[in-house]
């Protein structure tokens, strides 16, 4: 039992307190163990383990408050370090301080100094001890536990087991190999922590943060494991709303902070009050997580931070009272140790030897007590019964003692017999006690009484020792049972993981099938879309042709009306009704005669349109009788020109006076008839339209008739119903007047029976017709709705596609327009050049004319020969220039023609490109649809895989990438004389470790030489392998593993390390693991390392070629002295425990001109030992590897 250690720290007054007129009200005793608050009303005194004044340095706080806790952690205890106080009292400063590499190192807080202490202890530890350091960082925000290393985990659960205690499930654990790893984890957590600004603090913590550091120590010689957990708790400060000015979310946070702190106070009150039977740990997540730290298995130190100012007098007194109450809490701390099987056997053998010794000693005591009793009996002061009882008891005790020794000998082979042996041994002690009590009952001398007392005390001591040994045996058995239960739990977890993997495989197969089906459906959909687009295009073309034909019909109608008016006006209105008929008929016959050549075509069109129903003779008679009113279209089918000619001659003989106007009108009619022939096809189409309209009207009439028929039918059915009702009523009335029911059948007429049957038939038919009518009505409504939906969908798709096509066509037209403008501009420039050359040519021709005139004047008599020669030379020059210009002009003309041809060719090429672009856009549209479907499926599969990964991460298989390592690797102790081994300590460049083994590359400028001890491998056998050469070990990267990430390198060296683990041979006799390492070891040359392991001969060879020329072969062996593997479940790929590996290091033959630092000597800098377990075969996570990792944890 140990009390919580409480220390108090006061900070200096800040600007706000000085501005409010605050004064220091703190008085600290010279011994620094008590403090007095000079309050406004009364003074308050408090006693603590240590009180730090305002001028205390960070180092003093760490040495007095935190360093003892760290030492307890390294001894195997659980430790907790609380920081409690008002908001703005300096809690975070005490914990973290100011971590500035270039700043004052004295301002560093507890955490960075704690890191130094941990790694100093590791470096000073024995070389046979391996360390595994893990870190996690959580916060309690608004009563929700969040993982600060993985912000996606925002609502973690608290679990509890009897053997394991209380822990938070699902936290991210990062394996630590150096100081920078812990700092990276802390910085990541601090950056993700919830903070806000208040009046009292610019960066006020809005949550309780808990940093958990787990240190596991394994003694390779003995095989024991000690585990210590350190909880660094930075509590959020209690707040007073009037001082902080919290509003909104900040106010809600303050409420939850004060609530959790009040729950913590209630727990402390319940622990310090001896009358409380219940401790309210479950009232808050904070007290639930820190249950072991408050009254449990932990050594706890509480640092209370206070303000010395009178401005915060109430808060300071409340904080001090909290600390004084917490000082009374008692914890039950014990070393968390797991003994190996060898240790348990050694303890068991020791206990058995001590029991044997105690039994022999008991026998001696029994003999001594028997002699004493017999002497007393012979002297006459005792009774015979007493001696007899003592002798009998001694005999019985001797027999029981022999039985106990036999049971103990059997317990070596079977631990189940421990209870029987303990029971027999306890019976021996009871027998001895009975002997002594019997001997005491007899009257003895003073010497005898003293001897008896001494014997009684020795027996009591022996009995206590025996009980202790029995308790230790029980504890050992309990530990064995717990380990077996843990192994079973791990097996169950592995089975669950296997089932999850099978389900994921099934999901992947379903996903493949669905993708194949989707591809087939997409192809079919694309074909249907192409057919739909083709039909739409044809429909639009047909609609355009119909619109054009309608316009042509309208124009033909107007022209026909004009022709009719002209024909009507061509005759003379003053001539009698018979006289003018002759010229008109003759005027019509002439064009009909010309049109007789096409009689066959006209007859076919007339038959199609059903315009002419008369024979040719009837047409002639009608033309003779009614020529004034007949239309030119009706007379087109008259093909007998002879009758027409005769009719025309008769009319001319009777009316000679009207020949001249008739001939003139005849010419006009011929011209009009030609126009009619040209417009005849359009007229035929118009007549077809009129016939269609008639048909539509006929259809409408039929529909109206159908509606009237329907209404009449309904009326008829209603009348029939009324008649039926009347008949029934009449039957009822007639049945009421019947007096004698026996004569009813005789009196009922046969007609009434027939009417009843007819009524029943009519009712049945009516019901059937109604049902049929309703069914047809429903089907029609459904079809209409479906047609409307299809039309709406097609319309929307048409609009969307038209918009896309419009945009594309506009874009192409704009591009074509720009290209066309550029070509036209070029052509215009060339044309302008041609025009300019023609102008120059004209000017030269004018000059030649003037020169010729001058030449003529010169050739006249009296002209000078010199002037003629000069003019002749100028004329020659001009003709040469003209000839050159003509040649250039011809060239330009040919160039213009060529450019025109090129322009036309480019236009054709642009059209072809536009067509191909339209086709490509259609294909791209289809691909986009397919891509969208595939992306949706990919996202769904990705989400399922993320869920599986999250489940795997919960059992420790796939830890999140939080700046630390994902694979556990041990750190070997430095041997007691060496300094801290550093993997990467560079002031010029700091790189975060995110490789597969979370081990960054080594910078030669800042490495500490750490030679290993000479007897590292002497007289010991280990399960780890270490590269004990004058080079620096490079990190290993598991290629093909889910834990593989990129390895950042230092500025001076670039290393790429790959571990290719090939385990394709499942033969149990020979299972080889090849690890090829190709990287730059020591920063010089290309280095290749190969490690091979075979289960056939159980040997491991490490061949490292340094600088391309230096082979180093190092082999190691699995531990045969450590019996930790007894508790492991053997995997098929693991090495048998009986196998041994020979260590045969070869001396490296390194040339003097090659070195790691370029100076000709290999640097003696060494990395910490690299534990590589060669018993695993696959590089990926399998069930066997998961089982082994979980057993180690």
From Swiss-Prot:
- Alphabetized Gene3D superfamilies for the sequence: Kinesin motor domain
In the record, what terms sit under GO molecular function?
ATP binding; ATP hydrolysis activity; identical protein binding; microtubule binding; microtubule motor activity; plus-end-directed microtubule motor activity
Under SMART domains, the record lists: KISc
The segments labelled Disordered in the record are: 377-429, 573-600, 611-630, 638-665, 973-1016, 1032-1114, 1127-1193
Q: Where in the cell is it found?
A: Cytoplasm, Cytoskeleton
Among CDD domains, the record links this protein to: KISc_KHC_KIF5
Residue ranges under compositional bias (Low complexity)?
Answer: 405-429, 643-665, 985-1006, 1044-1078, 1086-1109, 1132-1149
Q: Where does ATP bind?
A: 85-92
Residue ranges crossing the lipid bilayer per the database entry: none
Coiled-coil regions, chain positions: 450-962
Return the InterPro entries for the record: Kinesin-like_fam (IPR027640), Kinesin_motor_CS (IPR019821), Kinesin_motor_dom (IPR001752), Kinesin_motor_dom_sf (IPR036961), P-loop_NTPase (IPR027417)
Q: Please, one GO biological process term?
A: cytoskeleton-dependent intracellular transport
Give residue spans, biased composition: Polar residues.
573-585, 614-630, 1007-1016, 1150-1165, 1174-1193
- Coarse class of the primary localization is cytoplasm
Gene Ontology CC, one term: cytoplasm
Question: Which keywords fit this entry according to its UniProt record?
Answer: ATP-binding, Coiled coil, Cytoplasm, Cytoskeleton, Microtubule, Motor protein, Nucleotide-binding, Transport
Q: Which PROSITE patterns match?
A: KINESIN_MOTOR_1 (PS00411), KINESIN_MOTOR_2 (PS50067)
Residue ranges of every copy of the Kinesin motor domain listed in the record: 3-329
What's its job?
A: Microtubule-associated force-producing protein that plays a role in organelle transport. Its motor activity is directed toward the microtubule's plus end. The maximal velocity in an inverted motility assay (moving microtubules on fixed motors) was 1.96 um/s.
Complex formation? Dimer.
- Comment, domains: Composed of three structural domains: a large globular N-terminal domain which is responsible for the motor activity of kinesin (it hydrolyzes ATP and binds microtubule), a central alpha-helical coiled coil domain that mediates the heavy chain dimerization; and a small globular C-terminal domain which interacts with other proteins, vesicles and membranous organelles.
Family statement = Belongs to the TRAFAC class myosin-kinesin ATPase superfamily. Kinesin family. Kinesin subfamily.
Listed name of the protein: Kinesin-related protein 3
